[in-house]
């Protein structure tokens, strides 16, 4: 079987689902002698809802997680992944990779499993909806108002268009991106090359 990243992602999601998890992203770095496969996971929506109930005090027992919602943080914005989750997923998925020979020609490879982190990538419409109101930095395929690099607060979606509030970043004086005279900019989701959250600590 030839190496196929989509096949690997699909296999990873099968394993993740059996653990109450979702695959957020898959990254691959290949070389002649060594390969690196990174899988980013989080609790699925049902499990995140349970953790949100725990953090609000509605459930007495709270498990220790890599990312629990801080005070004032939207509970939908954390992954809820534990080290035990990563370890269990890594064991099961590593076995599947070898049994189904999904890493052909790789005599050695490293499988790295972790949460997506506070600076996670946004890759789907659901991500933009879930993290509405968050700070984000993004780049576009084609320039918007003469600029391909933007930072701002996501003000919501209008159809397939993302509205970005630029005033938050101007007030903080962050970033070296070209400034726009406008306070908001509209960017088509299909024009977004890469988008990533900016942690607010």
From Swiss-Prot:
<dbReference type="GO" id="GO:0000028">
    <property type="term" value="P:ribosomal small subunit assembly"/>
</dbReference>
<dbReference type="InterPro" id="IPR036847">
    <property type="entry name" value="RimP_C_sf"/>
</dbReference>
<comment type="similarity">
    <text>Belongs to the RimP family.</text>
</comment>
<dbReference type="InterPro" id="IPR035956">
    <property type="entry name" value="RimP_N_sf"/>
</dbReference>
<dbReference type="GO" id="GO:0006412">
    <property type="term" value="P:translation"/>
</dbReference>
<comment type="function">
    <text>Required for maturation of 30S ribosomal subunits.</text>
</comment>
<protein>
    <recommendedName>
        <fullName>Ribosome maturation factor RimP</fullName>
    </recommendedName>
</protein>
<dbReference type="InterPro" id="IPR003728">
    <property type="entry name" value="Ribosome_maturation_RimP"/>
</dbReference>
<keyword id="KW-0690">Ribosome biogenesis</keyword>
<dbReference type="InterPro" id="IPR028989">
    <property type="entry name" value="RimP_N"/>
</dbReference>
<keyword id="KW-0963">Cytoplasm</keyword>
<dbReference type="InterPro" id="IPR028998">
    <property type="entry name" value="RimP_C"/>
</dbReference>
<dbReference type="Pfam" id="PF17384">
    <property type="entry name" value="DUF150_C"/>
</dbReference>
<dbReference type="GO" id="GO:0005829">
    <property type="term" value="C:cytosol"/>
</dbReference>
<dbReference type="Pfam" id="PF02576">
    <property type="entry name" value="RimP_N"/>
</dbReference>
